[in-house]
Amino acid sequence: MNALVIFGLLAVLMLTGMPISISLGLTVLTFLFTMTQVPLESVALKLFTGIEKFEIMAIPFFILAGNFLTHGGVAKRMINFATSMVGHWYGGLGLAGVLACALFAAVSGSSPATVVAIGSILLPAMVKAGFPNKFGAGVIATSGALGILIPPSIVMVMYSVATNTSVGALFMAGVIPGLALAATLGGVTWYRAKKFNYPRQPKATWGERWKAFRASVWGLLLIVVVMGGIYTGIFTPTEAAAMSAVYAFICAVFIYKDLGIKDVPKVLLNSANMSAMLLYIITNAVLFSFIMTNENIPQALADWMMGNGLGVIAFLLMCNVLLLLAGNFMEPSSIVLIFAPILFPVAIRLGIDPVHFGIIMVVNMEVGMCHPPVGLNLYVASGITKMGITELTVAVWPWLLSMLGFLMVVTYWPALSLWLPQRLGMI
């Protein structure tokens, strides 16, 4: 009964158009002060202890690094490198977009940032080269979702905060699925380009490829700094985030010189605004998690599933359906922070690896970012292409269907996610 009251109140507040963070906070406070005897002091204590986690500090640093790289011309150099490598294949610029999104995802940690950085440069070039606007929009909107699967990933950090799972293990677990999804999206792009005979670029010489690689190498080295540093134990994921922010600043301002010193305060302010917004969501989500635990809702869900003989396969299918439905109305950070505290205890009780479950949630978030009505990538791509959301929804379907198929593979083949972190001794 209490669960129905909590989720009913949350749904009503969200339907009024109230921001997710405020809806969460009001739901918790209303329930606590009217239907429980929980002391106010314990609520305040939980509020502060819940956000004292060291991992949370990684979020603003990864956001800052992504903003420096987005404004610093790194994306343009990555696109040139990607085009030199695959531009001569069918759908060359489209394949270059997939590859560039994968590379930029490995340094930004954000899907919308990836779509903006790559799409704003590549989409006009694709249209100019003779590609249909729909094709380019479909490629970039879906490939941009790689930003939260290929590490570093802000959504993975939030999952770690919500479930106390190792950030480093999550990052390593995202590498192979991220590359596999990039290959899948590239395959769809190549097939459609060949089917409709879309244009190909002239084949670049190895000299041109080497020149493009040298121009982009400073941005690509950030991948080595973050992932190499975490794996070798030189620094923790949070320290890696701080290092990536400093490196991205040096790269954008002093090496590439695409960002002037006078532009740095604007980047810092934008990063601070986004970080504050996410921290506010986390704060209210911590309270929501507290009330879930206090009312034993995850435990009751686990007991119900076990009592009805529902096993791992049925539970994971239910999770996918629930998370995909939530993706229709909420953005990834909110979904992870609301649903992870509810579903995670059940997953652990059923023997599902916490790292594998985290990757499943992240892939669900990727799909959610590419379908209406609240798919963030669709709105970002719409702003770049000037296409309507309905038209854009039709454009992304071939890639979106392949992502749904990939979701099933990730869900029921744990080795795809767990092989690398197990080999590295991280789990």
Question: Which residue stretches match the model-derived regions?
Answer:
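Alpha-helical transmembrane segments of multi-pass membrane transport proteins
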Residues: M1-I427
